[in-house]
Amino acid sequence: MSVTTAGPRQGRTARERGPWPRRWAWPAAFTAGALLLFFAVLRLAGTQPVKADAASNALQAWQMLHGNPLLHGWWLTDVSFYTTELPQFMLVELVAGLRPEVAHICAALTYTLLVVLAAFVARGRSRGAEGTVRALLAAGIMLAPAPGETAWALLLTPNHTGTGVPVLLLLLLVDRAPRRWYTAVAAGVLLAWALVGDPLILVIGVLPVVVVCLARACLALLHRRVLWYEIALGCAAALAVPAADAANRFIVALGGYTVSKNPAKLVQQSVLPKNVPMTIRSFLSLFGADVAGARGTLNETFAFIHLAGAVLVLAALVLGGWRLVRTLGWRGPSVADRADLVADVLVVAIVANIAAYFLFYQIKNVDQAHEIAPVLPLGAALAGRLLGGPLLRARLVPALAAGLAYYAVMLGFAASGRQAPPDNAAVAGWLEQHGLRSGIAPYWEANSVTLDSGGTITMGSVKLAGRGLSPWHWNEDMRIFNASHHTANFFVTVPGEQVTPARARAAFGPPARVYHFRGYTIMVWNENLLRQLGPPVG
């Protein structure tokens, strides 16, 4: 009897599991798609030259790998990226070494991770056809980087793009983990960790979680209910702020890096009307849809087609905003019980990021769109999460598939562009050939030359200070300006820099030799220029 009963049960189990190829089809397709996306984005990132910002991050990671984990002596920008992108740079440099291509590899890894995480957040707990449509819609919207400004804003440097990663991880945690106290603690730790690396987390992570959770909790209290999980999650998010501040102070106390003061402040009222069109263009540029900035028929076509992604995100934002208003309205606890916590946080995060950009920055060009770079992955996740089901029920999947295919083709076309050499690779090679190993330059030439040379040339960043020149407190290892231990006998500049050859002569006297190479002016002295620099300036 045991034989007759075991056979059918074993057969059902085999059928339920399905044949091996079917069970592995989706994981294989997912892996292949992620690899294809990585290499496409890597090629697209390569169309942009590696400049000083990315070079500085690469040099910081290199020092962290080689005995300076706290970046002693470094004066960073207003964003350290210490717990966000710099660990990724370290991992890549362990394999690839110190070279300009590290910046492109990190950009491709970050963007691929963002697409994957946005797809998972969009999918949520849905399975089957709806879960697939949700994920593909989010991933499709993110096939947006266009050549030029969009690629620069999203891929060139760790300029807030990667800050979307911890926020999406947080939303996955909230969506998938049990509603228990330890989930709230884990969320708070994740926010504190990310906040050390980028203060933007305060706007797109801490603030949305606190606002949504505590608003829900207060609404429930009015109906004599206590939402302990929302209270715990909101409090954990709020406590991430003092925790991150304590971590930053601890790093400084241990002799670690110093962060520059954030220059952002409320703009004057007269600036706001000018910010309106630039904010709109910045938003559209993230989706490759900045029609006003497109030049040429091909780029205009690219931008017009990519308007679809921006429109979908705007539609999801309106829908999500309406649901959030209903959740927080006087409709009783039943509405809040059915509300989507993740979608609510996404709505507040997107609105907060755009509002901060509009109110705190004098937006002069679309290049500043990197300040709202997380809006792209967060918006894509929101669109997939809220619109995937309705699109499926409206039988618009064929249209979605066609759009996804077209976006993929256009990404491939954008990735086929000419690969750009590092920004100052030519002059770095020239300096090596002429035996010049330690010098100074304006910011955009200094660390870039150091990276382009693989670290064989040391360059310090200087700026005007009165009638002389001084080291600049911005993405710089200030130890190299110690004239007792280091020397610098040449100066490099290009047309357009504030530090001109005339300024260098006024500061250091007549040079012993002057060279001109491809637009660069290289001035050499037979003395240590560090002794004639003024005190460091911010």
Predicted segment positions?
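Membrane-proximal lumenal/periplasmic loop motifs of glycosylation machinery
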Residues: 44-52, 65-90, 101
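Hydrophobic, aromatic-rich transmembrane alpha-helices
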Residues: 213-223, 300-337
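Membrane-interface alpha helices of multi-pass inner-membrane proteins
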Residues: 182-210
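Hydrophobic/aromatic-rich transmembrane helices and adjacent perimembrane loops
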Residues: 159-166, 203, 301-315, 334-391
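Membrane-interface micro-motifs in multi-pass membrane enzymes
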Residues: 78, 82, 128-175, 197, ...
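Transmembrane-helix motifs of polytopic, lipid-linked glycan transferases
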Residues: 31-35, 105-129, 169
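Short periplasmic/luminal acceptor-recognition loop of GT-C membrane glycosyltransferases, typified by
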Residues: 79, 433-471
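Signature aromatic-anchored transmembrane alpha helix within multi-pass, membrane-resident enzymes
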Residues: 27-33, 235, 239, 331-335, ...
